[in-house]
Regions:
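Catalytic alpha-helical scaffold of carbohydrate-active enzymes acting on polysaccharides/glycoconjugates
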Residues: 1-141, 147-202, 207-209, 213, ...
């Protein structure tokens, strides 16, 4: 039987309010709290909460044989705490099953890793501290923003205490190699690399509801046959 690694990524930014020229020097609060509340609450009830309930149900129905992982940004955690705390209660239940791993990522879902290693480390530590405080878990795997990875980053990830990293299974990098294997980082062999299967992931993320797609509708049986 093949092992399937499910990773679900959650991020919600703080949205900026309309800021006019005449507000400069007078109004120093830049965020649209009403819009943040509306979007985060709506998305949580339409997507995040039903998905988390489904994951919890699958874990319970399969006696822990079903496993998954979740990467959630610090910004998202802040907003859920403020607007939809019941979703965090669900994530806490998932954490307690021992079948859902929490993966670290930059607190602000930023691009700090590209040019500011100290800021990147600070944000990652902030996320890890928040996950430890809220769910009692310590991440050992990291998913950088948009799955960004480069060899110079690997030693820093090891220094931060990570054993593995998720990254993109980019065709132009892999060439003939498959994304369905665990690789070692060339610059830090202790770091394991898990690659996203672009096709199988995008079949769910983007093509699932596309009625113009040649494989629509995507059924469970069809998807399982592709995995095999």
């Amino acid at each position: 039987m093949k092992s399937i690694c499910f990773n679900f990524e959650i991020h919600q930014p703080f949205r900026l309010k309309r800021y006019r020229f005449f507000d400069i020097g007078r109004d120093h609060y830049y965020f649209d709290d009403f819009l943040n509340d509306d979007i985060v609450t709506r998305v949580a009830h339409n997507s995040y909460i039903p998905a988390a309930e489904t994951l919890l149900r699958m874990i319970e129905q399969n006696d822990g044989r079903f496993r998954c992982s979740i990467a959630i940004s610090g910004m998202a955690l802040e907003q859920f705490e403020q607007y939809v705390p019941e979703f965090l209660d669900l994530l806490e239940k998932l954490a307690k099953t021992g079948c859902c791993e929490f993966v670290a990522q930059p607190y602000a879902y930023s691009l700090a890793s590209l040019s500011e290693p100290e800021e990147f480390a600070r944000q990652v530590k902030m996320t890890c501290d928040r996950l430890k405080e809220r769910f009692g878990v310590k991440p050992t795997v990291i998913r950088n923003t948009e799955l960004i990875y480069f060899d110079d980053l690997a030693p820093q990830l090891v220094a931060l205490g990570f054993k593995g990293a998720l990254t993109e299974g980019a065709k132009h990098i892999l060439g003939w190699k498959s994304p369905n294997y665990v690789y070692n980082a060339a610059s830090a062999p202790k770091l394991k690399l898990l690659l996203r299967n672009v096709k199988l992931s995008d079949d769910i993320a983007f093509r699932f509801s596309d009625r113009g797609w040649g494989e629509w509708p995507l059924t469970t049986q069809k998807y399982v046959s592709w995995l095999g």
